[in-house]
Structure formats: structure tokens, C-alpha cells
């Protein structure tokens, strides 16, 4: 099984960045307490805090699915803070590919690397 990376890009609705930050703090607590296969989870904001990026690294597809299960209750509220796009990078399992089907998440498989 190969490492999977995720990128979620947010453009916040007016007045929603503080809500995003509050919810992300809760997500981070869950990630630290429950996720086993999460290697990296970083939340970035641009200078005027109108946009954010969540960068995620997981040991494998199973770790992504585990993470989604742990934070699932918070996702609807987080997605309501702005418009969101997402990408998965790597070789996701058939189960993860099926789980993301229809979600708007784009999957990018390796082409060249070193």
C-alpha cells in the first residue's frame, strides 16, 4: 500500500473564517487522539484569511478512510464555511476510490517521481 496525500482548498464565505478555525481546532484534537495512520495534517491560511488549504499525508488508503470516519461529524459544518475543492494524490485503493466517487474530489495518480 502506498502513501496518500490530500489537499483541500477553501474560499471562505464572508464572516466564516473564525468558525472554520474553531472547527479545525476540534478536527486537530480528533486527529491527534484517534488517527493512527495520519502522518501529517497541516492547515494553512493566506495573509488576509480569505482562503485556506488543508494538507494531509496518510500511510495508506485505509488511514484516509479511518480519518474520514473519525472526523465525519465535523465535516458538514466545516464545508459550510466556504466553497471547497479537494484532491487525493497517490494510488488509492479501490475502496477509497469508491468512497470518494461523486464527492467532487479529484484523484491524481503518479506520473513521474524520483
Model-derived features with residue positions:
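Short S/T/G/P-rich N-terminal loop/turn motif that feeds into the first structured element of a domain
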Residues: 1-52, 59-70, 79-114
Amino acid at each position: 500500500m502506498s502513501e496518500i496525500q490530500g489537499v483541500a482548498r477553501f474560499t471562505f464565505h464572508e464572516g466564516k473564517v473564525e468558525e472554520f478555525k474553531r472547527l479545525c481546532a476540534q478536527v486537530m484534537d480528533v486527529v491527534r487522539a484517534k488517527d493512527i495512520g495520519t502522518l501529517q495534517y497541516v492547515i494553512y491560511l493566506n495573509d488576509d484569511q480569505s482562503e485556506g488549504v488543508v494538507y494531509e499525508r496518510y500511510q495508506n488508503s485505509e488511514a484516509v478512510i479511518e480519518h474520514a470516519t473519525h472526523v465525519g461529524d465535523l465535516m458538514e459544518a466545516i464545508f459550510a464555511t466556504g466553497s471547497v475543492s479537494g484532491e487525493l494524490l497517490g494510488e488509492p485503493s479501490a475502496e477509497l476510490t469508491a468512497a470518494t466517487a461523486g464527492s467532487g474530489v479529484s484523484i491524481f495518480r503518479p506520473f513521474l517521481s524520483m
